[in-house]
């Protein structure tokens, strides 16, 4: 018996049902890699960031997330080179979906009990996504803006429902506005740290502040 179509599990009807000691025998999620491209690129190398944002409250299967990841990665490698971007899938499939297997052969009514004891066995995993939640993000150089939009547009076709593409006003994957970012780094209020930054507040021990600005 094949996998049941994901349209059967599209809507968030039940409470979150994660893998636990009570919910065992869950098959592994299809998506294993959540970061692709040049993951270790410094924060100042990729200022542009594009998001795919969900416009529906629904469930996205791990197979769909994997398909979208592959699709976006393939296009970005072709258009920007394998070291010209960093893709991050922002959803993780933790919700377990179940299936109550029914026999469809002759004499099945003698072998099974129909809807008696209909709590199913784990079949796979899905990610629950809210309206306005980011599904996937890509950071890259400013000249690759059109490529980011096209990569996310192609990846959208792998998902049910409606998604929007949003070019962020923030710098890369950080939470700071792009127009203020370079000034804050120059003032040493932000310290680059891998693909993120450390924020140095204006309060705290004076000795620390003096050591930083000396």
Curated annotation (Swiss-Prot):
- Its domain of life reads Eukaryota
The cross-link described as Glycyl lysine isopeptide (Lys-Gly) (interchain with G-Cter in SUMO2) comes at 175
Subcellular localization(s) per the UniProt record: Cytoplasm
UniProt-listed CDD domains: Ribosomal_L16_L10e
Which molecular-function annotations from GO does this UniProt entry contain? Answer: structural constituent of ribosome; translation regulator activity
Instruction: Report where the covalent cross-link Glycyl lysine isopeptide (Lys-Gly) (interchain with G-Cter in ubiquitin) sits.
Output: 188
Q: Which Gene Ontology BP terms does the record give?
A: embryonic brain development; liver regeneration; negative regulation of apoptotic process; negative regulation of transcription by RNA polymerase II; regulation of translation; translation
Q: Is-annotated flag, keyword Lipid metabolism?
A: no
Q: List the disulfide bonds.
A: none
Q: What is this protein's name?
A: Large ribosomal subunit protein uL16
């Amino acid at each position: 018996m094949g996998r049941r179509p994901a349209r059967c599990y599209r809507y968030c009807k039940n409470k979150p049902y994660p893998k636990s000691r009570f919910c065992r025998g869950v098959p592994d999620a299809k998506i294993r890699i959540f970061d692709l491209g040049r993951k270790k690129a410094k924060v100042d190398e990729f200022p542009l960031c594009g998001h795919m944002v969900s416009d529906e409250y629904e469930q996205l299967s791990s197979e769909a997330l994997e398909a979208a990841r592959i699709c976006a990665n393939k296009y970005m490698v072709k258009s920007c080179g394998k070291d010209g971007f960093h893709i991050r899938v922002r959803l993780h499939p933790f919700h377990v979906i179940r299936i109550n297997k029914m026999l469809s052969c002759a004499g099945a009514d003698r072998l099974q009990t129909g809807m008696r004891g209909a709590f199913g066995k784990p079949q796979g995993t899905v990610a629950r996504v809210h309206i306005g939640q980011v599904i996937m993000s890509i950071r890259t150089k400013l000249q690759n803006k059109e490529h980011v939009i096209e990569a996310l547009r192609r990846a959208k076709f792998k998902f049910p429902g409606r998604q929007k593409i949003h070019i962020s006003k923030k710098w890369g994957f950080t939470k700071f506005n792009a127009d203020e970012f370079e000034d804050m780094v120059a003032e040493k209020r932000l310290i680059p740290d891998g693909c993120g930054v450390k924020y140095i507040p204006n309060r705290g021990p004076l000795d620390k502040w003096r050591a930083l600005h000396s």
